[in-house]
Amino acid sequence: MRGKIVVITGASSGIGQVAAEKLAGMGARLVLVARDKARGEAALARLREIAPAASHTIHYGDLSRLAEMKRVASEIAAAEPCIDVLINNAGALFGFRQVTEDGLELTFATNHISYFVLTQGLLKSLQAAAPSRVISTSSDAHKGLKLDFNDLQSANKYRGFPVYGRSKLANILFTSELARRLAGSGVTANCLHPGFVATRFGDQSGGFFSYVVRAAKVFAISPEKGAETIVYLASSDEVANVSGKYFYKCRQATPTRQAQDDEAAKRLWSETAKLAAVGMD
């Protein structure tokens, strides 16, 4: 990874922070994306301790807001004409339905649309660095669920964990369609389930649901363990030519039938482009 440029979201805590530190230790230069400035500066300082010779940087933005997604992508693209690895790493879960200033359901905007918009905005830099990689953090929470294209915004019925699970299903379908569109370009796209990890995940979900999530963390794995598959997909030669796949514990895994629906993947792409008001050739 020496000299490689890695962009990673969700990098100021949890598995994103651990993955960034591991990759910095392997010689990569990290470009962090974070919302909280205090945690972001702490994460950046830690990277500079690990690899003081590398010019690690950070960009701040709220990736639930379309304008912020696009601004951050534009700023990074201008600063980084070549990007070797993009790691989309979002996993917010909310107990109550919330709507962003763009009229988007908050979970779907943060966990899925931000992946789409950031990848769109950084694609030229990824293509310029080919062979390069797009890695998206998904989850086994997608199991047993399917997308309702008549209600992608969960307006009719909202339950926190299924809404989260559908956003993670969207990550897998996004990865599949991205891989199809980028075939032969030198840019690969894969996604992963990190496991149930003891991080800040779910702390902001609200009410009784937040209590349940915190209580369940007694059974969770460490962020270090959860970050292993991210680091593997970013760095291993074993997956250099693998694209469109789902991984768990550094191995290919099989997602549900609903997550392997090519027509659903194409339709989700189209619907997401409309919601995000962007296109992708």
Segment roles from a protein language model:
Residues 203, 258-259:
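Short glycine/threonine-rich loop-to-helix capping motif typified by GTGT followed
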Residues 147-152, 204-207, 246-247:
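Short, flexible, mixed-charge acidic loops at enzyme active sites
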Residues 198-214:
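A glycine/serine/threonine-rich, flexible loop-to-helix segment
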Residues 9, 156, 160, 212-216, ...:
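A short, mixed-charge helix-start or loop-turn motif at secondary-structure junctions
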